[in-house]
Amino acid sequence: VIDLLTADFIAAMRDKLRTDMNNYTDDLANGQCTTFEQYKELCGVIRGLAFAERHLLDLAEYIQKEENDE
């Protein structure tokens, strides 16, 4: 079982990443990009946040597995 501090950190980070990703996606959907360059940049930011979230979830899974193996 992941200790409470680690679990709280992971949950807080995931919530922040998800909130940012949703906000940027809303900006994209609402036509905030006026140039293709802005569109590409915003897509890159969203992609980076998605990668960060995936890595965070993978890390949480790894920690859980390691603790279960002990």
Task: Name each model-derived stretch.
Residues 33-65:
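Short, charge-rich amphipathic interface segments used for partner binding and complex assembly
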Residues 1-30:
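N-terminal acidic leader/helix
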Residues 1-5, 61-70:
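Short intrinsically disordered terminal tails
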